[in-house]
Amino acid sequence: MGLAIVLASIAVRGQAASQSPGLQIIPQPKQLNALPEVFRFRRDNRILLANPGSDDDRFAAQDFIDDLKASAGVAVVISKGRLHRGILVGRIDLPQIREVLRQAGLEVPTTLNTEGYVLIVGADQVIVAGKTEAGTFYGLQTLKQLVRGEGADAFIPAVKIVDWPTMRWRAVSDDISRGPVPTVDYIKRQIRTEAFFKMNMHSFYMEHTFASESNPLIGPTGGSLTPAEIRELVAYARRYHVELVPEQQTFGHLHKALRLEKYADLAETPDGDVLSPQQPGSYKLIADWYQELNELFPGQFFHIGADETFELGEGQSKAEAQAKGVGAIYFEHLNRVREVLKPYNRRLMFWGDIALHHPDLIGNVPKDMIVMNWQYGAADDYSSYLKPFKDAGLDQFVCPGAHNWNQIFPNLEAATKNIVNFVRDGQRAGAIGMMNTTWDDDGEALFESAWYPIVLGASASWQEGAVDIQEFDRDFDWSFFRSDGNEFVKAERALGSVPSLLNAGTTDELFWREPFGNQFINETRNLAERTHHMRRIVEDVAESVAKNENRARRNHSAVAAMLFAAQRYDHLGRRMEVVQKFSDEYWNAYLNLGDRVKVRKLRYYTGAIYNNLREMAEELSILKENYRRQWLAENRPYWLDSVLARYDQAIAMWLAKSRQIDEALRKYELSSTLPGPEEFGLGTRPSVPIPNR
């Protein structure tokens, strides 16, 4: 069949359409029409570049070839000459591409913006044509997801796609200042994976982790991005059409710099984290940092941070704040930073939280600055947060969150609602971009666990309107893991539901909470049924992941991250059950000291073979080693020991508690008495009768 047959009319134009059965693409294309025929790979498969001199197109084609070989076992080469059968790649305005599209009767819609592309698959030819080289690259990312089968059975279903992004900028912000600092290789993985889902911006959140040559004391050795690394990453990202944006804080969150005696005078309050606008040296520090960053990051933007300046007006600027208000000082600082950075001709981004607290002063923000409007609540409607900046004529990004911070695994119930609704409302308000944020507040978050919300943000910002979560989940396993079915997304969603199930704001905090105390033990009693249910859920996840892990042809490391999260959750549940049972049985023994049978049941917490307390330490030892491997797979060794120390402390605590109960039982054999339960931190007396066990 000829190519023209592929170009059947499209029922839905200019808006996101539900995908045809069997086609699983994230983000969903704007216009899509599928036909029953297929393009089958043969030994002589070739890719022809319409512009052989385009380094960008050659790179994009080779990237497609490498992925095809790795994921489907198919070999294709780039060749010259006329194309009779194979894949033609190039810009829409090139003569060869124009002629093919003319013969096919395809008119490129006026809505096709600079990152848009046309993808046509027929029985003999595949055409990937972008408005620019970026569009061609994105067309090839879609083509990767269309390839089905493996080896000699690999094929591409016949399809016509016309696609373009709804939002100009589709970004990820990665916190590299609260503990984990990714390796260069892992940042490259982030760039590749984000670009695969058509994201075009990656921002480094930095408080003290830029290895500044002008201020070398601030950046920790082994835990900072060096100039050489940045140059390498900028060049790498450019090939994937990803702009790297430095976010070097310029106001709050600077404690790790200000704690140094050299910079202590710049702090708004002693040992604080806000840079004082009263000190000229504050602006000298900012100027030094950004003079270096300007040489390293050649893009359009600087992100100056400036969120959560809680101490402003409480120290050096107190008198001025009393005279004219904290808000006025804040906006004056923004303008001063803008003047310092003006020679670099960048658009400055800043977090919008403080501005929202002073809506009457938003008009003081220069119109060339961009508001990074972060909101992390899971709301139905975000329009009230968007309206003040829209009314002021300011460009803004919507900045939802992956909800990975302080969690064993991201809270996907909160993240899904936050991302889908905030991006939808941002589009309605004319936001120019979306920046999905990951945070490492407690220093132990693993980025590899956060891909589901990251990919959801990519989909929400490319597509128009609200993402249909059922369709997104239907497509996720294929698009992300290149795996048929839905076993992995079910595991993601199950793990992501645990914070709500346990009614736990932060599951990391619950995991590390002191287990021997009234609060924890009473809470475990109240959550007993939920804990049992949670353990069944996460054990089902672990079993499913173990059975299916070899089916993941892409992003296999994310499977390991899910399995580790399931194991941590299971240990948390078991710990809650062990502590509750230990408390109940100790109280039962303490209230029945004359019943030696009941007392001797406490041997299950001291024995050489069966020892529930020692088992907790053993499980933690295994988790500790697993965590170490997970960490080093994506991060530098820097900061790892501070997290592993938490495991060591917990292991020592369980072993000490076992020795303590063993000593108590030895004394019981001599005196028929036991220490009071409060000495073991075993909570208050149970309010319901303790069952005989």
Labelled PLM ranges:
Residues 1-9:
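Bacterial N-terminal signal peptides
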Residues 25-27, 33-34, 41, 112, ...:
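Substrate-binding groove of N-acetylhexosamine-processing glycoside hydrolases
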Residues 67, 105-342, 349, 398-400, ...:
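Feature activates predominantly on carbohydrate-active enzymes
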Residues 91, 206, 438:
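Short secondary-structure boundary segments
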Residues 52-53, 178, 377:
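A generic structural motif
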Residues 14-167, 421, 444:
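Contiguous, structured surface segment used for ligand recognition
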Residues 92-94, 250-251, 308-311, 354-357:
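Short, internal active-site loops enriched in acidic
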